[in-house]
């Protein structure tokens, strides 16, 4: 019984996950799940936690360090006694001490190191937000791809329904001698080709769901589906890339992280320069000893009396003045200045990359908008043309070849319209996302 209970306990997370997959997932659910389970995001979260520890360590560097020690020694033969004389005897010595030291001045290296640790934490937090943004975009893109493939499957199924109706119609006409058997066979061939198209569309849908499930770190995407919201394409007046970039550069975490790191290089330079200045340290402590000597010619003090008599506190201040460090300090300063220039280039590259991304998204949105308009017009025209061709075909005024050509053209224009719809929807939302808006449909 215990084994059964244990097995059920181990299986319960998997069963809970399977139950979660039984309902269609919304985009918000997918995004929330991905942010919680994505390994890259988890790695960035651990990096933030590590930086928090480093900041705490830096802040505590102002505190004094305190340590204690206990020693016990035993000497044989001629040795030094407690009264500072030498004699041939066995001598034991027990010592106790506690001491500490504190940094008073180190050329402002400590406050700059604390500031650097704080900036490193801010940069790590920005990196975490960047990782989250990357997974948000990837999940949204995959989600839209699934929606597109759903629509293509619907289009393919409608074509099969149309072909089935035509096959049934021709078979009925052929039975009465009003249609040739060749027409029936040709229509069945068209029906078979539509079946192949449907199989391909369904396979593409399964692959799209698999891709989305992998982004969500699902161990299995079996039974996984998404909610199909009502998509309404609105006419959006797109701002120019320059204006979008002006809004985005101040909020994008990728740029903000590099800006913070550039500030950090200034602190690193000051830390390197601090090695040019003298350092001042305070130290102090207390200690005591206890001695025993065999064959002593006089009575020895007790343990506690000796500790009291030998008690010796001390305090001191030391200054370390750098004179020649084999050019290490000079080279560290040079290296810190070079790191500043390198980080400035890294910041410029991040801004340049952001601008290119916005330009690409803007160009894609403009192209998708134009394609959506033209494909919508083409699909409407193809629907009208197909209705006319279908009516002619059913009245014997059009051939089956003309009918199938019109049907194939309708399928193509409908597919193009669906693709343009979701591409325009995603690219326009992506531009809003660059400006700081949440991703959504």
Model-predicted segments: where are they?
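Terminal intrinsically disordered/low-complexity segments used for targeting and assembly
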Residues: 1-33, 202-243, 297-298, 432-441
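Short segments within alpha-helical structural elements
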Residues: 193-218, 379-437
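Short flexible linkers and secondary-structure junctions
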Residues: 19-145, 280, 284, 327-330
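Bacterial Sec-pathway N-terminal export signals of envelope proteins
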Residues: 18-67, 71, 77, 220, ...
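Sec/SRP-type N-terminal targeting helices
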Residues: 42-46, 59, 90, 104-132, ...
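Periplasmic alpha-helical coiled-coil/stalk elements that build and connect Gram-negative outer-membrane
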Residues: 134-247, 364, 368
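Short, charged, amphipathic alpha-helical segments
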Residues: 118, 181-190, 400-408
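Small/polar, glycine/serine/threonine/aspartate-rich low-complexity segments that form flexible
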Residues: 19-23, 69-102, 228-237, 270, ...
């Amino acid at each position: 019984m215990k084994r059964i209970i244990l097995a059920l306990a181990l299986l319960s997370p998997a069963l809970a996950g399977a139950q979660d997959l039984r309902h269609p997932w919304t985009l918000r659910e997918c995004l929330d799940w991905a942010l919680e389970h994505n390994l890259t995001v988890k790695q960035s979260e651990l990096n933030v936690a590590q930086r928090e520890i480093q900041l705490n360590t830096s802040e505590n560097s102002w505190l004094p360090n305190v340590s204690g020690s206990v020693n016990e020694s035993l000497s044989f033969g001629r040795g030094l006694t407690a009264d500072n004389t030498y004699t041939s005897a066995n001598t034991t010595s027990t010592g106790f001490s506690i001491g500490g030291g504190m940094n008073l001045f180190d050329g402002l290296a400590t406050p700059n190191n604390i500031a650097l640790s704080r900036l490193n934490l801010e940069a790590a937090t920005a990196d975490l937000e960047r990782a989250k943004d990357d997974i948000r975009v990837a999940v949204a893109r995959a989600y839209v791809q699934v929606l597109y493939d759903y629509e293509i499957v619907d289009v393919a199924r409608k074509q099969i329904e149309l072909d089935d109706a035509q096959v049934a119609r021709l078979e009925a006409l052929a039975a009465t001698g009003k249609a040739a058997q060749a027409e029936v066979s040709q229509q069945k061939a068209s029906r078979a080709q539509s079946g192949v198209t449907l199989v391909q569309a369904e396979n593409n849908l399964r692959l799209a769901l698999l891709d989305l499930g992998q982004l969500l770190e699902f161990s299995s995407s079996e039974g996984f589906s998404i909610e199909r919201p009502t998509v309404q394409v609105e006419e959006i007046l797109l701002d120019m890339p320059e204006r979008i970039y002006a809004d985005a550069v101040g909020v994008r975490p990728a740029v903000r992280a590099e800006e913070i790191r550039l500030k950090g290089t200034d602190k690193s330079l000051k830390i390197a320069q601090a090695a040019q200045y003298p350092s001042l340290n305070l130290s102090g402590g207390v200690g005591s000893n206890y001695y025993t000597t065999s064959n002593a010619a006089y009575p020895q003090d007790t343990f506690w009396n000796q500790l009291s008599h030998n008690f010796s506190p001390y305090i001191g201040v030391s200054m370390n003045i750098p004179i020649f460090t084999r050019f290490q300090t000079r080279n560290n300063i040079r290296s810190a200045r070079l790191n500043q220039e390198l980080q400035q280039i890294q910041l410029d590259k991040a801004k340049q990359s952001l601008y290119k991304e916005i330009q690409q998204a803007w160009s894609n949105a403009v192209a998708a908008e134009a394609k959506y308009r033209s494909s919508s017009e083409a699909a409407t025209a193809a629907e009208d043309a197909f209705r006319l061709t279908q009516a002619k075909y059913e009245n014997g005024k059009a051939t089956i070849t003309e009918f199938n050509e019109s049907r194939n053209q309708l399928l193509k224009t409908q597919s193009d319209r669906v693709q343009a719809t979701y591409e325009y929807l995603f690219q326009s939302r992506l531009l809003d996302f660059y400006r700081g808006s949440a991703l959504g449909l």
